[in-house]
């Protein structure tokens, strides 16, 4: 099909800090309905907006949010829609996609989750909504004046609903819904990525590692986006200890910060 994209069914990025989701990095994120979550935790992925877009795709129409791919295809290029639909984890779910159709709920095979904004670094390419250290600096010194406006302006981020909800972690309804869904979601999961914030500063990361250890999944590819230098050495030691119990895990690190002499040659 010229309008079908398997990612709309099989892939999800969940931003549990602010209750937003999308099924690809090109479309904008949209809000997760809290009322729907109370009875259906899969609404972290299977939102009304996504179901409407799935219906459009099945009807041969082009969802507006996927305009990045449409523009590429309109000039004869091969877009990410084609690549994402051809991924092994997407192809493995073809029967489930057909069964779910536009309105049914489906468990994605590729999941990326952001549990927490907490981070001890303030990398120049990052933002206050993804780093508590960045947020603290902007609150103290204000946004950065640049040629066409202000960089990392908190008011602007707040209006875009990018800043995390001001709730304690144990009161976050999006995190609560995730853990309700997790045992069922995990069964056919093939790719799982934890981002942040800094994942090693969040208890959910270690809870995930313990669950995976107790419930082995031979098909699972798991990774974490980490700066590899949490503020407390005990966190790194605990992370290494849990990694050593798992068969394979990927650590996504900024290559510019990689120190070949650090001795940390046990990770990829």
Predicted features along the sequence, with ranges:
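Detector for the c-type heme attachment site
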Residues: 70-74, 126-132
């Amino acid at each position: 099909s010229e309008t079908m994209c398997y990612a709309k069914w099989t892939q999800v990025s969940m931003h549990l800090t602010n209750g937003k989701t999308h099924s690809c990095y090109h479309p904008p994120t949209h809000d997760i309905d809290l009322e729907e979550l109370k009875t259906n935790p899969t609404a972290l992925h299977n939102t009304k907006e996504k179901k409407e877009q799935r219906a459009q795709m099945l009807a041969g129409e082009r969802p507006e949010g996927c305009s990045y791919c449409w523009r590429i295809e309109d000039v004869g290029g091969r877009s990410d829609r084609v690549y994402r639909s051809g991924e092994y984890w997407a192809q493995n779910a073809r029967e489930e996609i057909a069964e779910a159709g536009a309105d049914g709920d489906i468990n994605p095979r590729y999941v990326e989750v952001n549990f927490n904004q907490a981070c001890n670094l303030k990398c120049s390419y990052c933002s206050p909504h993804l780093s508590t250290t960045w947020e603290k600096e902007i609150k103290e010194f204000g946004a950065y004046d640049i040629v066409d406006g202000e960089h990392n302006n908190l008011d602007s981020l707040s209006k875009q609903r990018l800043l995390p909800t001001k709730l304690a972690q144990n009161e976050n309804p999006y995190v609560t819904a995730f853990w309700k869904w997790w045992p069922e979601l995990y069964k056919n999961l093939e790719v799982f990525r934890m981002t942040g914030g800094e994942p090693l500063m969040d208890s959910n990361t270690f809870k995930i590692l313990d669950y995976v250890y107790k419930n082995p999944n031979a098909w699972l590819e798991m990774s974490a986006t980490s700066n590899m230098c949490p503020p407390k050495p005990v966190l790194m030691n605990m992370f290494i200890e849990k990694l050593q119990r798992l068969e394979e895990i990927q650590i996504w690190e900024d290559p510019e910060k990689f120190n070949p002499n650090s001795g940390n040659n046990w990770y990829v």
